[in-house]
């Protein structure tokens, strides 16, 4: 039946429908559809009518009532018409049944138009079931309705489905674009409502009013499918339909959510633009409303800056808030928070005024007189109605920022004022004076402030309790008044210079006076109506006059803007001068303490808190008047700005109030902070704080971890303390829900002690605000203290404890008492307190000798808990002590470099402050206390072990007996010490970047030794001893010797041996006489040397010179013949020349003394382990650098050195942005695109060559059948994720040929189109070097092959499509790939599997296990690198047979057959190889470097002398503050990537001598400072100068047919940042260097021996793998050797005594190493340090040493 109907109407197509029943489309700017169905109003007010006259035909319906919606009502059917819109056809309910789906197979094939299935339709009567329909259904969104004259009728609310049915319903328009979907879905929802389906539309909460029926779901699906074609749906809609194609309800719900969000944004913008506030509601509520709106808009991407927000807020202010519009118009940098401060101040003033309800006087003679007067009040508070702020945020003082100038100020003068003056003088604008309005006032010439808002007038202020004036000319009987406190509306202090009388002479010749305060720090002269009322003068604002109570008019009032003014002409001038007034305040004879000093003394607390504390005697010893508060208002502490920087203020009222009913110490708040990273193990990483709810008393305890037992110990301690000290019991402890508080152990403890745990709600920071705010405050103080003092970060908890002590003693502004007072304790005696980090000298009661200094420099931390002493940090001892034997070091405070503190000196203040305390100590001290060794009560910092940062100041170097560098002083008397700038050390933040160093031109360290004959005046003599710069500080077994070189600057000998010193000159700083030290024997010299840090390992002395190889023989490692000697015999070790005796150079005296940093160095330097061994340490002279390259350096000026120290490391401020930015840096592009090479190439010849290469590539692609040429696919038919973009790339090869390559964009390939588990293998570089070395020793032929278009031989399994090449001109078509095109993720793996299978099955090869791409059979070895093959064999015919088989399958080219007996040159994987069979092989990259380096734009210096080494020891990379523009930063990082990338490529290929420098600089790629770039340039310069160097191999001639594989290992202990060690290994095969490695140890070693063990253990796995490869390729016996210069390591390896190192940190690794040596039959041998060529891998060396260790194997 249905098919018959369709055949009768063939023009009706599936999926199309039409209707003449339409509703008028309303076009409006407003949203035509509200957000939810529950709130939707009818979009159309009534149903539309037909264009022609309508007639209705009643119809009977037997359709049963639908329980989910209203019963269908009879509808009027329009009669036939001649218009373009045919008559609507109705259908029966049976026809609406979706049973037709089974016939057509899918809902999309249903023959019914969707709106015909709406439940509102029913059979109208007998008529044709399928009348003529239009060709389309609906109209596009952009098409207006074709109907006219539509009428509307009211419809009921959409909240209920029991509504009357509309007679005619217009279908929704067709969706024509994904961008129109939001508008379309609104009309679609309206269509559903009109179809009586409003109840199924999701509401705001995403749920419909009622459940949808199956028929309604069918109707919903079909209408959506027809009117919203799938190609025009947004992506998020397609994603929903891809899961369930019938889930239209979810689409509607999501759409409503999006519309709700858009509506919220629009509502917020409208609300913000129409703000109104007059003080009728609380200011807090108004602020919360505005800030919430701004935050929502910002979160939704609509940024509202402070300027716009302030303008919108001020525009809506009215009433008493209106004046903020005018007083803020010059404040360009005002923030919303600052504006609300003013609003809060005015609101609080209003509330105070309402509570006090001031009385207004009435004039008895005139009831209409509205004279207002306030009774005078004695409170010294001035609420300025015109608060002003400065243009910047330096000061919050209400200063005089005037708003008008003298050019437009009124100048008319009229002294006569009649009583009949009733009209107010209105001046709405200062220019109104020129519009005929006369101002009946005159100005006083000498008091005219021309930039006032109304010059020559006083501002009448009803809110001010005192009169303030800026000019001193009107003040009578002036006197100082330091005790008066005046604040403005924002509670900011206003400094007062003087107090006096202000005398008036009014027009009725009456005179009167009031009190006046003089201050220049106000915006306007304020006349208090309260004080006028006190002298019977009131202001009548109805008549605008000042008058007495009897009605006598005294002066007129001028209204200008929103304020009222009175002329200054009625003031009587005084004869006092301005300087007299200004100097009144400073005439006191007693000098006061400066506020900056007190601010720092009291832990950087704010001025208001300090004043409260002094006023309430919570701080004793001096009073509030003893402090100079004049600078407190505008003082800006830079350390506070840095340390206490916050995002915004804490929200008021966030604290809960329910704890107020508890007694002191019954309710505690607690919280844990941490961890703090990159600290020594002895320093705490956490702290736990406690705060009492009632007294606000605070406790802090350090923690090393957050384990249950650690937390339990702290709880036990504080509960016992409160119980014993305060006789109180804790009832409740409030804490968060961290696991450290919710564990069962603590819960049982609290339950046992009867304590209720009160846990806060998860993520509710407000409920836990007390503890969290305390932690934040303490951390702010901590950062500020560390910033101000410069102490290292591991003392962070000392700063926390200092802050806790002080803050427990400061009064709270609310309670007016301190926590100590609430707890019943006495106030803090400030005379016992020292500023945090104050330099002091601590008495050493037990020095090492009688001639050593008695004082040790230190830094005061905080008062001791356990004694009357002070906790002092001693950097030289790396510990803190509790002592009273200290002296405050006087001198200027030297703080941060960026702030100038030199103008501040508090020595005299500090002496005055502590005088009484020290006199008390002196008078009561019976005997000298020897408490230096009393450890601090803080065990966590009693011994600071392995601390990477040390204080760097000359004083500590001069007097510390344990410092690594003997003192270097230049003092003439003791006064020189007091003037030295002493500052605690700065450390490099480990979160910024690794602090590393690289070789460069720097002065060598010149250590000094104090003379025995030091003078008693405090001066010290220095012993000038010529010492060479250290070559290594890592190994304690490396001996240290004094120099014996005759010429210190140009000595060619390797001067490291022991020697006797004769006639060592001594220069005294106190005179010019030179003294000599008698000839000292070697033994006597050693007696003076004190080794402070002996090695952790064995007792075998390694400080003696070892001139010969000392083999360690064991039964396991040595056969009968001397295996060690045979292993070392043919290695390329240096030949040490004889060393002539050393004479001292006179130039040595001129070298300036420099103190070595006490941190570790990756390039040498003096560390703690070298303490007092400087005479026999390895040094080198300053002139021992042969380089003359002119590269700028970030060196410090010797004349301007502060404490003779290197510049402090500075933190990078843009690290996070820098790391993000570098991710976006693209690698350098060396190829050309199609348009660059062909389309727009102006070089005709080059263009022709590229065209030729292009056609050659296309022909090769077609030849290889790369894609399916039989069929082209339409782009719309293919899944987009299977379409791979492709492109042609062009480049010019090194041999001059032009090459084109058609590649796929694998970088944007979808992950579903390849198997991520497949690997693309290539030959390892060690395998290639091993094969080349064996080829030289076995006279192998080497043949080089290339397979053209190798990837195209591999089939592709996945279904992938690409765009055709450009010349085909089919941009809208796709072709399917059949081969692995270059660039695809899987192409490399596919080719590897293809060629591997062919070599194994067809060529009879097998792959060496563990070494991918290395194939071998009994005759040939093949190394495969993508499409390059290198063949090795004794018989050239064997290679030819393999080549013949390869040519059968692949297009194989013979690059070099290698058949000549003469020298043959190869270019194998970037290496330029010269090979003569049976003689030698040379590996280099001269041609490649000659071509590439000049293209790097490096400032090369070809004319200067060549560099002798890639760097030199002794230079630190300073982490300076890196402030670069983003583009400049990206450019420099890009440059570093290119330079280090090239250096790495060269280094890992064959220049193993450069690996240390490359590895170090690679760590600073993201920190391209000028110093780092200069060092990189120097490295590239060295590579350029030595580009002709080659790795030299000679054929070995062993006595027996064996292969010898040796690894030489070395380690530099603790020379990397944070005491990491640098390890290095060099691998040799038959005496030929085949590889090297230099890297930073992954773990921190605790001794030299552990570092050496770590280096050896890192080399063993590769050694074993290479051994297996060699045995597979060459069937000869193999001997494996392991060489090290650490005898202690060897003794551990060969020893059978496990107790020797069982309890040491490296015991496990040592045991494993012993097993590996034994199990792999490794021969462990000792090599002399001076012959250890692996030394170049671990540290920078002097030029001569570097050449000596490398000239045997690379030259």
Swiss-Prot record:
Where do Polar residues bias regions lie?
1-10, 48-60, 127-152, 1005-1015, 1031-1043, 1054-1082, 1095-1106
Q: Where is this site: Cleavage?
A: 401-402, 582-583, 1217-1218
Which residues does the annotated region (Disordered) include? 1-93, 126-173, 352-421, 956-1172
Question: Among its keywords, does the record have Electron transport?
Answer: no
GO CC: one term? cytoplasm
Q: Which InterPro entries match?
A: Aspartic_peptidase_AS (IPR001969), DNA/RNA_pol_sf (IPR043502), Integrase_cat-core (IPR001584), Retrotran_Ty1/copia-like (IPR039537), RNaseH-like_sf (IPR012337), RNaseH_sf (IPR036397), RVT_2 (IPR013103), TYA (IPR015820)
Q: Which region ranges are annotated with the description Integrase-type zinc finger-like?
A: 583-640
Q: Where does Mg(2+) 2 bind?
A: 1346, 1427-1428
The answer to whether UniProt assigns keyword Signal to this entry is no
Spans of biased composition, class Low complexity? 153-165, 402-418, 960-969
Primary place of residence?
cytoplasm
Residue ranges annotated for the Integrase catalytic domain, each copy included: 660-835
Which residue ranges does the record assign to the Reverse transcriptase Ty1/copia-type domain? 1338-1476
Name the active site residues. 461
Subunit note? The capsid protein forms a homotrimer, from which the VLPs are assembled. The protease is a homodimer, whose active site consists of two apposed aspartic acid residues.
General remark:
Retrotransposons are mobile genetic entities that are able to replicate via an RNA intermediate and a reverse transcription step. In contrast to retroviruses, retrotransposons are non-infectious, lack an envelope and remain intracellular. Ty1 retrotransposons belong to the copia elements (pseudoviridae).
Q: What is known of its domains?
A: The C-terminal RNA-binding region of CA is sufficient for all its nucleocapsid-like chaperone activities.
Q: What is this protein's record name?
A: Transposon Ty1-GR3 Gag-Pol polyprotein
């Amino acid at each position: 039946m249905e098919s018959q109907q369709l055949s009768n109407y063939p023009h009706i197509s599936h999926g199309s429908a039409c209707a003449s029943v339409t509703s008028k489309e309303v076009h409006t700017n407003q949203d035509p559809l509200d957000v939810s169905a529950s709130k939707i109003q009818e979009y159309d007010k009534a149903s539309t009518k037909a264009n022609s006259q309508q007639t209705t035909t009643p119809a009977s319906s037997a359709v049963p009532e639908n329980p989910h919606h209203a019963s269908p009502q009879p509808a009027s059917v329009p009669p036939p018409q001649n218009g373009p819109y045919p008559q609507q056809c109705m259908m029966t309910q049976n026809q609406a049944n979706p049973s037709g789906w089974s016939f057509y197979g899918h809902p999309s094939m249903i023959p019914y138009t969707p709106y015909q299935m709406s439940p509102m339709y029913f059979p109208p009567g007998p008529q044709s079931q399928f009348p003529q329909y239009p060709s389309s259904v609906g109209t596009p969104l952009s098409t207006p309705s074709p109907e006219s004259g539509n009428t509307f009728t009211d419809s009921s609310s959409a909240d209920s489905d029991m509504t009357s049915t509309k007679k005619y319903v217009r279908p929704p328009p067709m969706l024509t674009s994904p961008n129109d979907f939001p508008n379309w879905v609104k009309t679609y929802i309206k269509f559903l409502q009109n179809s009586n389906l409003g109840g199924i539309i999701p509401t705001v909460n995403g749920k419909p009013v009622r459940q949808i029926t199956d028929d309604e779901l069918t109707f919903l699906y079909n209408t959506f499918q027809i009117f919203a074609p799938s190609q025009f749906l947004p992506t998020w809609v397609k994603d929903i339909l891809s899961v369930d194609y019938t889930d239209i309800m979810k689409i509607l719900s999501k759409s409503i959510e999006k519309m709700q969000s858009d509506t919220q944004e629009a509502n917020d913008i409208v609300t913000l633009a129409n703000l109104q506030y007059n003080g009728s509601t609380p200011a807090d509520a108004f602020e919360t409303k505005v800030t919430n709106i701004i935050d929502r808009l910002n979160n939704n991407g609509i940024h509202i800056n402070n300027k716009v927000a302030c303008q919108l807020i001020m525009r809506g202010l009215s009433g008493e808030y209106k004046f903020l519009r005018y007083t803020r118009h010059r404040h360009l940098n005002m923030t919303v928070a600052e504006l609300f401060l003013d609003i809060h101040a005015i609101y609080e003033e209003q509330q105070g005024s309402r509570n006090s309800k001031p009385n207004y006087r009435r004039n008895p003679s005139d009831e209409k007189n509205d004279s207002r007067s306030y009774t005078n009040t004695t409170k010294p508070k001035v609420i300025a109605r015109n608060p002003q702020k400065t243009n910047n945020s330096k000061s919050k003082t209400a200063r005089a920022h005037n708003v008008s100038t003298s050019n437009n100020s009124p100048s008319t003068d009229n002294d006569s004022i009649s009583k009949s003056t009733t009209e107010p003088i209105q001046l709405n604008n200062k220019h109104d004076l020129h519009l005929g309005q006369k101002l009946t006032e005159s100005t006083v010439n000498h008091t005219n402030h021309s930039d006032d808002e109304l010059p020559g007038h006083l501002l009448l202020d009803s809110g001010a309790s005192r009169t303030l004036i800026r000019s001193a000319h009107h003040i009578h009987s002036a006197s100082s008044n330091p005790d008066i406190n005046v604040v403005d509306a924002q509670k900011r202090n206003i400094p007062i210079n003087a107090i006096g009388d202000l005398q008036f002479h009014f027009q009725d010749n009456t005179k009167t006076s009031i009190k006046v305060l003089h201050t220049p720090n106000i915006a306007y002269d304020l006349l208090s109506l309260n004080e006028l009322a006190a002298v019977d003068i009131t202001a009548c604002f109805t008549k605008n006059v000042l008058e007495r109570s009897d009605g006598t008019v005294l002066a007129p009032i001028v209204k200008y803007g929103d304020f009222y003014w009175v002329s200054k002409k009625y003031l009587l001038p005084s004869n006092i001068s301005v300087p007299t007034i200004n100097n009144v305040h400073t005439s006191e004879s007693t000098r006061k303490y400066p506020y900056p000093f007190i601010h720092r003394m009291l832990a950087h607390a704010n001025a208001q808190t300090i004043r409260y504390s002094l006023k309430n005697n919570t701080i004793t010893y001096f009073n509030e008047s003893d402090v100079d508060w004049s600078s407190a208002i505008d003082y800006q502490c830079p350390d506070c700005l840095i340390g206490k920087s916050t995002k915004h203020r804490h929200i008021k009222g966030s604290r809960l109030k329910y704890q107020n009913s508890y007694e002191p110490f019954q309710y505690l708040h607690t919280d844990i902070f941490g961890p703090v990273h990159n600290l020594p193990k002895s320093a705490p990483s956490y702290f736990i704080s406690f705060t009492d709810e009632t007294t606000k008393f605070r406790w802090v305890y350090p923690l090393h971890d957050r384990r249950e037992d650690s937390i339990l110990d702290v709880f036990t301690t504080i509960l016992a303390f409160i119980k014993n000290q305060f006789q109180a019991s804790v009832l409740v402890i409030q804490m968060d829900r961290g696991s450290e508080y919710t564990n069962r152990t603590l819960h049982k403890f609290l339950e046992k002690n009867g304590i209720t745990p009160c846990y806060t709600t998860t993520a509710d920071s407000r409920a836990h605000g007390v503890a969290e705010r305390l932690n934040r405050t303490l951390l702010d103080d901590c950062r500020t203290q560390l910033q101000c003092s410069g102490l290292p970060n591991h003392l962070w908890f000392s700063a926390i404890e200092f802050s806790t002590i002080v803050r427990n003693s400061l009064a709270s502004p609310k309670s007016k008492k301190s926590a100590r007072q609430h707890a019943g304790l006495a106030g803090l005696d400030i005379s016992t307190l020292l500023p945090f980090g104050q330099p002091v000298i601590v008495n050493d009661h037990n020095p090492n000798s009688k001639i050593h200094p008695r004082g040790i420099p230190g830094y005061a931390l905080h008062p001791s808990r356990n004694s009357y002493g002070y906790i002092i940090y001693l950097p030289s001892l790396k510990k803190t002590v509790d002592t009273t034997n200290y002296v405050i070091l006087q001198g200027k405070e030297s703080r941060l470099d960026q702030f100038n503190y030199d103008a501040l000196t508090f020595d005299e203040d500090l002496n005055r402050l502590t005088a009484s305390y020290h006199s008390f100590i002196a008078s009561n001290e019976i005997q000298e206390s020897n408490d230096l060794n009393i450890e601090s009560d803080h065990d966590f910092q009693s011994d600071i072990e392995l601390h990477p940062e040390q204080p760097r100041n000359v004083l500590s170097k001069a007097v510390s007996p344990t410092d690594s560098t003997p003192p270097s002083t230049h003092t003439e008397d003791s006064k020189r010490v007091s003037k030295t700038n002493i500052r605690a050390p700065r450390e490099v933040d480990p979160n910024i970047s690794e602090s590393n160093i690289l070789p460069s031109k720097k002065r060598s360290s010149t250590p000094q030794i104090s003379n025995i004959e030091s003078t008693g005046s405090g001066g010290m003599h220095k012993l000038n001893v010529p010492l060479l710069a250290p070559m290594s500080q890592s190994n304690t077994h490396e001996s240290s010797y004094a120099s014996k070189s005759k010429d210190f600057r140009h000595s060619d000998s390797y001067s490291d041996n022991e020697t006797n010193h004769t006639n060592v000159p001594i220069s005294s700083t106190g005179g010019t006489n030179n003294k000599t030290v008698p000839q000292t024997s070697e033994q006597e010299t050693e007696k003076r040397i004190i080794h402070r840090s002996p090695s952790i390992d064995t007792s075998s002395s390694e400080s003696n010179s070892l001139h010969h190889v000392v083999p360690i023989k064991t039964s396991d490692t040595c056969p009968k013949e001397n295996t060690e000697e045979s292993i070392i015999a043919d290695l390329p070790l240096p030949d040490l020349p004889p060393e002539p005796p050393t004479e001292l150079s006179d130039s040595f005296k001129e070298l300036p003394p420099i103190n070595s940093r006490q941190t570790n160095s990756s390039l040498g330097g003096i560390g703690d382990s070298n303490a007092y061994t400087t005479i026999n340490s390895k040094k080198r002279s300053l002139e021992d650098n042969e380089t003359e390259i002119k590269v700028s350096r970030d060196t410090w000026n010797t004349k301007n050195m502060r404490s003779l120290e290197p510049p402090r490391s500075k933190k990078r401020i843009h690290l996070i942005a820098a790391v993000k930015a570098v991710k976006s840096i693209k690698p350098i592009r060396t190829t050309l695109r199609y348009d660059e090479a062909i389309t727009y190439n102006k070089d005709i010849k080059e263009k022709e060559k590229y065209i030729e290469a292009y056609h050659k590539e296309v022909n090769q692609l077609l030849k290889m059948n790369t894609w399916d040429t039989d069929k082209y696919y339409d782009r719309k038919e293919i899944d987009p994720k299977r379409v791979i973009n492709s492109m042609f790339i062009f480049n010019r090869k090194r041999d001059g040929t032009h090459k084109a390559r058609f590649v796929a964009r694998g970088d944007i390939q979808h992950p579903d189109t390849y198997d991520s588990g497949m690997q693309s293998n290539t030959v390892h570089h060690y395998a290639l070097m091993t094969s080349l070395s064996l080829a030289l020793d076995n006279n192998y032929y080497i043949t080089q092959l290339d397979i053209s278009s190798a990837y195209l031989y591999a089939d592709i399994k996945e279904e992938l499509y690409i765009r055709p090449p450009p010349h085909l001109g089919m941009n809208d078509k796709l072709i399917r790939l059949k081969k692995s095109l270059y660039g695809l993720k899987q192409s490399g793996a596919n080719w590897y599997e293809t060629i591997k299978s062919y070599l194994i099955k067809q060529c009879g090869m097998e792959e060496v296990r563990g070494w991918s791409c290395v194939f071998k059979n009994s005759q040939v070895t093949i190394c495969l690198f993508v499409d390059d093959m290198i063949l090795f064999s004794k018989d050239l015919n064997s290679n030819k047979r393999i080549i013949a088989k390869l040519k059968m399958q692949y297009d194989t080219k013979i690059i070099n057959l290698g058949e000549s007996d003469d020298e043959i040159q190869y270019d194998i994987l970037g290496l330029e190889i010269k090979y003569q069979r049976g003689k030698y092989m040379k590996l280099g990259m001269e041609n490649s470097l000659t071509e590439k380096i000049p293209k790097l734009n490096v400032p090369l210096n070809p004319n200067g002398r060549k560099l002798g080494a890639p760097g030199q020891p002794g230079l630190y990379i300073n982490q300076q503050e890196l402030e670069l523009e983003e583009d400049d930063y990206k450019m420099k990082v890009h440059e570093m990537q290119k330079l280090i990338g090239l250096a790495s490529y060269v280094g890992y290929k064959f220049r193993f001598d450069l690996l240390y420098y490359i590895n170090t600089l690679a760590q600073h790629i993201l920190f391209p400072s000028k110093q780092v770039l200069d060092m990189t340039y120097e490295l590239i310069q060295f590579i350029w100068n030595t580009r002709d160097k080659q790795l030299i191999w000679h054929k070995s001639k062993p006595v027996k047919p064996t292969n010898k594989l040796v690894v030489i290992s070395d380690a530099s202990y603790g020379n990397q940042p944070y005491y990491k060690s640098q390890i290095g290994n060099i691998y040799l095969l038959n005496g030929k260097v085949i590889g090297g490695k230099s890297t930073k140890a992954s773990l921190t070693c605790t001794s030299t021996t552990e570092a050496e063990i770590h280096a050896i253990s890192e080399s063993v796995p590769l050694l074993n793998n290479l051994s297996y490869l060699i045995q597979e390729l060459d069937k000869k016996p193999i001997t494996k050797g392991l060489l090290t210069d650490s005898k202690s390591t060897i003794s551990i390896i060969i020893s059978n005594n496990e107790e020797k190192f069982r309890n040491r940190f490296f015991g496990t690794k040592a045991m494993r190493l012993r097993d590996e040596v034994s199990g792999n039959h490794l021969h462990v041998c000792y090599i002399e340090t001076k012959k250890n060529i692996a030394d170049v891998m671990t540290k920078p060396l002097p030029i001569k040493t570097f050449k000596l260790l490398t000239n045997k194997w690379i030259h």
